[in-house]
């Protein structure tokens, strides 16, 4: 069962159609690593994360940000089954990577911030409410494998 109204789905999909995954993905993951520096420990193989400029200019950060937002695009296509959509990723992040599930919530909130910056007046309070609901649903789905 979905908690998303028709209005939520319309707000999410119409904004998503405008999102440049490459730009928004790198910006979102980069900001996560700058604002919440303890998250950097999951990205040891990314090279220098020694300063905000190093993080924001890091091609591996940008590439992984694209991967994250591409995955989010799949969620947007499957809003009625977020848990099913993220089953394998939840297992990977829980069992192999041991990512604190709180980080999923933080990433979602950073994404909402990035969307607000990129889309300004289009990112109305109603659109934000729909996106907050969606990123909370994604965070919950990603945390579903945790005990």
Curated annotation (Swiss-Prot):
GO biological process, any: hydrogen peroxide catabolic process
GO cellular-component term (any): blood microparticle
Binding site for heme b: 64, 93
UniProt cross-references to PROSITE patterns, sorted A to Z: GLOBIN
Annotated keywords: Heme, Iron, Metal-binding, Oxygen transport, Transport
InterPro entries: Globin, Globin-like_sf, Globin/Proto, Hemoglobin_b, Hemoglobin_oxygen_transport
GO MF entry, a single one: oxygen binding
Entry comment describing in which tissues the protein is expressed: Red blood cells.
The Globin domain, residue ranges: 3-147
Subunit comment: Heterotetramer of two alpha chains and two gamma chains in fetal hemoglobin (Hb F).
Homology family: Belongs to the globin family.
Reported function: Gamma chains make up the fetal hemoglobin F, in combination with alpha chains.
PANTHER family given in the database record: HEMOGLOBIN FAMILY MEMBER (PTHR11442), HEMOGLOBIN SUBUNIT GAMMA-1 (PTHR11442:SF52)
Name of protein: Hemoglobin subunit gamma
Provenance organism: Callithrix jacchus
Record gene name: HBG1
